């Protein structure tokens, strides 16, 4: 990244360039770019925007599920037997970014109805100023689920905008089909995702039985 900066400065020596490791992929840093653009339109200078992004990058959440575990098994992250049984009974691992930018499982929910309910409740407890936000929903071949997730989010939070996008191939090849996740700005992500794991466990109790 520093090399790229140096090359640009050779041709445009007066350019202001800031390097930020977003610790996010695809829709995550796409959302950061949207917010940065909005801040510039509000009159904030590039230094202020860059500092805000650096200071707040661990407030960008990824909340969603994987419902096809076969690809996870192929990547060696789960045994084939567990992947088969999990998919068969409708187990949906719930993922979130940790403080290092790695997608980490924070809970496992059974069935779409429960998963939708817990995900929307999770967003409610972690998002900030939902009505002022643009929320991005990313998917790999689960557009029907993404549309339902969008409907539930719009009904609950009335955000400024909800966008649905496909995960591009570079990331999708490492994820496989079955991903559906919302990206938004919220409370700081906790160390080791301990608070987020506890939150999913607590919320899931409301829908058991």
Give the location of each predicted region.
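Mixed-charge interfacial surface used for oligomerization/domain docking
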Residues: 1-18, 24-34, 38-209
């Amino acid at each position: 990244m520093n090399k790229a900066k140096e090359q640009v400065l050779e041709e445009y020596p007066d350019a202001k360039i800031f390097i930020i490791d977003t610790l996010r992929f695809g829709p995550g840093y796409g959302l950061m770019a949207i917010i940065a653009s909005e801040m510039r339109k509000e009159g904030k200078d590039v230094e202020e925007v860059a500092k805000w992004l650096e200071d707040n990058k661990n407030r960008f959440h990824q909340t969603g599920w994987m419902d096809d575990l076969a690809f996870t098994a192929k990547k060696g992250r789960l045994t084939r037997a567990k992947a088969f049984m999990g998919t068969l009974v409708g187990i949906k691992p719930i993922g979130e970014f940790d403080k290092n930018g790695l997608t980490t499982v924070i809970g496992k929910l059974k069935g779409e109805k429960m998963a939708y309910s817990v995900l929307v409740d999770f967003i409610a407890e972690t998002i900030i100023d939902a009505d002022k936000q643009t929320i991005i929903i990313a998917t790999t071949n689960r557009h029907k689920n993404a549309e339902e997730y969008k409907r539930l989010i719009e009904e609950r939070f009335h955000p400024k905008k909800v966008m649905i996008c496909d995960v591009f191939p570079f990331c999708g090849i490492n994820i496989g089909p079955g991903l559906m996740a919302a990206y938004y700005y919220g409370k700081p992500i906790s160390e080791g995702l301990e608070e987020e794991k506890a939150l999913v466990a607590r919320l899931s109790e409301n829908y058991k039985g």
